[in-house]
Curated annotation (Swiss-Prot):
This is 2,3-bisphosphoglycerate-independent phosphoglycerate mutase. Binds 2 manganese ions per subunit. It comes from Shewanella amazonensis (strain ATCC BAA-1098 / SB2B). The gene is gpmI. Catalyzes the interconversion of 2-phosphoglycerate and 3-phosphoglycerate. The lineage of its organism: Bacteria, Pseudomonadati, Pseudomonadota, Gammaproteobacteria, Alteromonadales. InterPro entries: Alkaline_phosphatase_core_sf, BPG-indep_PGM_N, Metalloenzyme, PGAM_B_sf, Pgm_bpd_ind. Keywords: Glycolysis, Isomerase, Manganese, Metal-binding.
Amino acid sequence: MTAKRPLALLILDGWGYREDQESNAIFHANTPVLDNLKANYPNGLISGSGHDVGLPDGQMGNSEVGHINLGSGRIVYQELTRISKAIEDGEFDDNPALCKAVDAAIAANGAVHIMGLLSPGGVHSHEEHIEAMIRMAAKRGATKVYLHAFLDGRDTPPRSAKGSLAHFTELFASLNAGRIASIVGRYFAMDRDNRWDRVVQAYDLITQGKGKHSATNAVDALEAAYARDENDEFVAPTAIVDANGDSVSLNDNDALIFMNFRADRARQISRSFTDPAFAGFERAVTPKTHFVMLTEYAGDIQGDIAFPSEDLVNTLGEVLQNSGKTQLRISETEKYAHVTFFFNGGKEQPFDGEDRILINSPKVATYDLQPEMSSTELTDKLVEAIESAKYDVIICNYPNGDMVGHTGNFDAAVKACEAVDTCIGRVVDALAKVGGECLITADHGNAEQMRDPSTGQAHTAHTSELVPFIYVGRDASIAEGGRLSDIAPTMLNLMGQDIPAEMTGRVLITIKE
């Protein structure tokens, strides 16, 4: 076997660039490796938000969107944009999957249950979509419409759900067609790391109306949670009961519509509702519902899909496969789906010649408790892969900046950035020994802003800041005005490979002769 000189793409998740030093964990971190690379190698800033990644103008980027754009080499119009457009055009009200579920529930005298992240965050869901769904169900004649609200506080300020809950309480009153049935923090309902002890609590809340707490209206329930010192993300499962103290349960022939459009945090709880062989926890009840997912969460999840994904051909992974190249995808649990499923344009199956390495993220309640996460183990495996000379291309994601950034803990975020910097030093050294090269970038910002200047609260959400782009390799210049979709064609060009017509991104690096 000929020894390969790998081209590595290192994605520093949640690592944006911000001039302002206030609450900027990346600026305050001691990062000698990255400082040295920026001083001595071609680098610039590229865009990972808004129209540049297929999101509405001004919308912050996120990991799913970022990796789809990175891997596909074109601007991919995201589900948020597609679904909002369908609502504007009136097509949403005629969506076959949604109409079928609502009509079936009405015909069986059942209820329409709508669940999802009630948030204007636009990362996993958008509350405007949830409102459109409630209005559509009522318009079709449903009188028992129940909202199971997952609360955010991660892609939004930590205590910001009150306005949304008040608005939806008023919406139901005006439609006279149901009510908010439960509230629960996303920590429970949207886990993606097999922490079934959390998910079962959300499942029991939705299926049986059993929560740790109860209240007669959602805003009171939220105020009680705040009094218990629970921010939105961590609100304990709370049933909203009627005047008789009765909660809402999920029954056979009801419709269950999941309004999250992003797959990774929707999969686990979806499987608990739909998989006959589900083994994550003991289910007290298993109602047979008309289940609809807003987008396809995974090929093996049973249910109708309101907005099937658009097929992306000739992504970077596919082009490498067709050229007979070998590739490695590697990350921790938290971002493994991003360097595989999302980077491959929503395809689960690995391409020929594509290996995958999953490093378990630490089992801690929140990552500020272990800001280095599993970066050392990840880097051990990555360096080993580089030294093996088996791979033409390596795609690696370091989750720390994002996952610790989401906690709002500034000191922990600084430590997270420092841990990643140390790891990058090891990777760059390993690449140098085998004649490899690397590109360093990020999918979106986060850790560069840890406090919200307007509210004074911790800033736990992503940002719309530009992200770094560094080329560690030959003498070269970098074009300005780049975006994430330019990375894949740039990589192919560095490898001397043809760029397919579907990749509309630009080549950002010009090698100096």
